[in-house]
Curated annotation (Swiss-Prot):
Organism, scientific name: Rhizobium leguminosarum bv. trifolii (strain WSM2304)
InterPro entries: Hist_DNA-bd, Histone-like_DNA-bd_CS, IHF-like_DNA-bd_dom_sf, IHF_beta
Transmembrane segments: none
Protein name in the entry: Integration host factor subunit beta
Ribosomal protein is among the record's keywords: no
DNA-binding as UniProt keyword: yes
Cellular compartments per GO CC: chromosome; cytosol
Gene name tied to this protein: ihfB
Length: 99
């Protein structure tokens, strides 16, 4: 699913809202999540999951085309941990081993 499909589904479930308003709401939610992550904050959507950022330290890497060793700088990467309810919907009937 892409963002425009999400907007269409939400708009169809909420016929009292204009399509452009739904698009603005979806964009606002995504912008707020992005801004929070950029500020180093964690975003938790209970039952769905939690977004956070993790630090990847600098390391030596290898250029797959040439085989040369290259230096990869430290960077921050987004991370998503699924919530219990989402895991249960994806794997119905399985006991949750993490919690």
């Amino acid at each position: 699913m892409i963002k425009s499909e999400l907007v269409q589904i939400v708009a169809a479930r909420n016929p009292h809202l204009y399509h452009r308003d739904v698009e603005n709401i979806v964009n606002a939610v995504l912008d707020e999540i992005t801004d929070a992550l950029a500020a180093g904050n964690r975003v938790e959507l209970r039952g769905f999951g939690a977004f956070s950022v993790k630090n990847r330290p600098s390391r030596s890497g290898r250029n797959p085309r040439t085989g040369d060793t290259v230096f990869v700088e430290e960077k921050w990467v987004p991370f998503f941990k699924t919530g219990k309810e989402l895991r249960e919907r994806l794997n119905p009937g399985q006991a949750d081993e993490e919690d």
